[in-house]
Amino acid sequence: MKKIILLIAFPIIAFAYTPTTEKNCTPIDLRNETLGEVRDQHDISWCYAFTGADMLAHSFGVTETMSAADIAIGHNETRVGLFVRWLDLNLLKRKNPVTRQMAHQNGFNKVSLLAAMKNGWCPESIFPSDSWTKMSRAENGWLETQVPLAQAMIEISALHEIKKTLTTKNIPYYYSFKNVDASGFVQLLQNKNISNFYSDLRKAVCRDDRHAFSETGKVKMVIKNPRIFTRISKQLESGRLVGLDYDSRILKNSSNRGVKISELHTSGLVGRRWSSENKSCEYLIRNSWGTDCTNSGYDPSYECEGGNLWLTESQIYQNMTSIVYLPAM
């Protein structure tokens, strides 16, 4: 908790870093079938949960895609998650009504990893993270459509506002999941606040499909320091992904330097190589904006491989705040 508060209070720690030499920058690529293609968080700020799902799957050899939605909502139930939500609603985004209509989005990779290892994981096929199934009342029954998650949350909030008037006979639409039909959805809506609705939804949907991890380990968080790349390389060399907390503006502007709290983003580091052109060790960032390299807004100077981008140590260091990793057990 102390490190997380420090991260919020001091997002920029300006020290010169120790660059990795060419000799110590041997090629590493940890992408495999377990990770699969880069996923797309769309308009939901659950980057830390998508990265966490990758880290857990890769570390524990889970071949089935994990639900990032499950990880994110699990994070929101922790003390840190509750505090960050309060901070968002009361200090950072109190003038934005949309914030109150959705499951809380901002979070910390370390906290979500610890909660997920404690709670177990739910498959993406059971609790999707990109779109949800909407059932709209029609003349001859229910009409089924897929709705992007951000829009689904806004529509669920609208129902929550009138929850006392709703029954299975008059609800205009609901969202269908395993273990949750129209009746169950109406019952879940009766929660006093929207965050409790999502907590109970997650538990109901995943109750028959939650898997425990084979073992639980430690989660390390290291704040930016001059020898941070030594720590990163050690983890990559041991076959471990590294979660990177940094300013997302560097993805769209290669000249960006510095960190704004409102621009904090989390991605995974999945590879390393030496660039003779840049005379620098480069790292492969596995982002969560999908596989499209052309229309995702990335700086055109970057080499992009299906949503994975190569950045130099200098670019990473001057825009980062910390790393998180699961040390080998």
Predicted feature residues:
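Active-site nucleophilic cysteine motif
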Residues: 41-57, 101-114, 265
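Cross-family signature of deubiquitinases and ubiquitin-like deconjugating cysteine proteases
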Residues: 34-63, 68-79
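Papain-like cysteine protease catalytic cores
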Residues: 65-179
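Sec-dependent N-terminal signal peptides
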Residues: 3-13
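Active-site signature of cysteine proteases
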Residues: 18-21, 36, 160-329
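Non-catalytic, low-structured ubiquitin/UBL-interacting segments
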Residues: 14-34
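Acidic/histidine-rich, surface-exposed loop or edge segments in extracytoplasmic proteins
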Residues: 28-39, 89-98, 206-217
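Structural recognition of the beta-strand scaffold that forms the well-ordered cores
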Residues: 46-49, 70-73, 81-82, 112-114, ...
